[in-house]
Each structure stands twice: as structure tokens, then as C-alpha cells.
Amino acid sequence: MAKQDLKKGELAEERLRLYFLNLGYFVVRSIKADFKGFDITDVDLFLYSRPSPISRERTNVDVKMKQRPQALERIFWTKGLQDVLGLEKCIVATTDKRSHVGEFGAKHNVLVLDGNFMGKLDSTERYSSDRLTEEELLDMIELYSVGELGGNWKKCYEQSKSNLLLKLNFDGVNHYLDMVKRVLEECSSGFTSQATIRMLYIYTSFFLIALDYSIKDYSYKDQPDRVRLISDGIRFGEKGKAKSLEIISMSTALLKSFMAKEEHDYGAIEHEVLSQFDSILSDDIAEYLGSTKQMQKLFSLAMNFEKHGYDRQLQSPL
């Protein structure tokens, strides 16, 4: 695929993405932050890092390459977005070179990458890469759309990116497992293309990041406890086993209040629902991922899968 010409802002985002990748961050570009189906804003770059076994850092980056960047206003906006999303850090990248912009940002715990920094980034080939841009990947997804993959490929991909902001928990873990399953089903049906393989790599990287964040507080626990917590997370979602059992009990009680007891075996209904949960094969994956050795590898594996997803020279696992 030939390299695609990008607009000034898109090019700046790509160069910053490469810059942060080289620093060891997991980076996702152009994420929609929405609420109940309504798009609120875009996060230009989302950074994820693993400073220690028990800490994680998530950062939203605002990139504005306009002649009149309104940098001070962007600092307010970006800091507010960080607080709303519950992230740990935020960064503003701007063409503004005035020193007081950086001072104002530092006062409010916002790192400012000013025009001097961005100019150096633009003038060097240091961070050039044989990677697809986000625009090229999206074009490829649309061009090679095969099968249904649960509907619109692009929509599924955009929602999966959004979940890194909104569902970086076991609900997100289960979403990414489902997306990996759908892509594998697509491949097994004979619909293998660059798009399917790249999506397999990228969804796997999202799954690993979501899992890494979800279990960050488990490192001090014994392995049997970690395995149980991961298994319950995959089986019952973020609310956990206790909350799920409570919902089942409440639902059964509600049915009893509206329907004659002699017409239905409510115990059998409750037992069947629990059986459906128990049928989810989460124990094996939890046993594997719950070991200290594998937990330490999640972030580096995610970085490698992300790289394979964007490499121009695609390596097929099939």
C-alpha cells in the first residue's frame, strides 16, 4: 500500500505517536469519547504505560497545529478532559512557542510540548517508521471488508478504541475477547485478508492492555487468588460474581411477584442461568494469565501485537 498524504494535524499526531512509541508507551490514536451513543470529543492520542508492577499511567494528549492554537484554552480543556475520564496525566502539543504557556501548564500539572519541540519533531526523520498510519489502516478496513464481523468493521474498531477510555476493566476484557473470537471465526470461514489479520493483532493488543490494567492490584495476591479473580472477571464481568448473583436473585424474585408460582420452576430457571455462567471457559485462560511470569509479560506482548498490526510488511500467523 502506498503511503497516504496526511493533513498537518494528522501528520503531527502520527509523528507524536511514533515519538511516544519509541519512549516505550502503548499508543492509540484518534479515540472517540462518547456517552450513550453521542460523540462528545476526540482524544488525539491515548498513552498507556506500566511504570511498576502495581502502577499504571493513562494519558490523554491534545494536538493542535493551528496558526492560532489558543494554547492556554487547550490546557484548560485537556486538563478537564483528563479529570472527566479519570486518567492520570495529560499533555498538550501546540505550535505556540511562548514560554508562559509551558509555565501555565506546569502550574496545573499539564505537560506542554511547545512549538520549539514540535518544530524539531517535524524537521527530523528520526522517528520515521515502516508503519501504516491510522488513516491507511481505516481505509484498509473499509477496502477489505469481508463478511459481517458483527456489522460494520470500522464501527466495531472505533468502539473498541473508545473502550480503552471508557471500559478499561473486565467488561472491556470480555469485549476484546469477543472481537478476537469474531475475527478468528471470520478467518476460519475463509475470509482471510490483511484487514482481518491486522484486526486480530490489534484487538489482541487491546485485550492485553485491558487485562493488564484490570489486574494491576492483583500482583500482591497469591496465585490461586489471582486465578480466581481473573476467572470471575471473565465469567461475570466487572461487577463480579457477588453482584451477578444478586442480580439473578432479584430477577427471580421479580418473576415470582408477577407470575404464578405453580406455572414455573424458579429454582430451575436460576440454576440454568448459573449453569450458563459456569459454562464459560474462563478457568484455563485465568490459570495461564494468572501466573506472575505471564502477568509481567502482558504489556510487552501488547506492544508487540500492536507493532505487528501496523507493520507495512504484514506477517501472517496463519
Regions found by a protein language model. Give the residues of each.
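Acidic-basic catalytic patches of nuclease active cores, encompassing PD-(D/E)XK
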Residues: M1-F35
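Catalytic cores of nucleic-acid endonucleases
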Residues: V63-N116
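Domain-level recognition of nuclease-like catalytic cores that cleave nucleotide substrates
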Residues: T95-W153
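Charge-dense, extended regions
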Residues: S249-L318
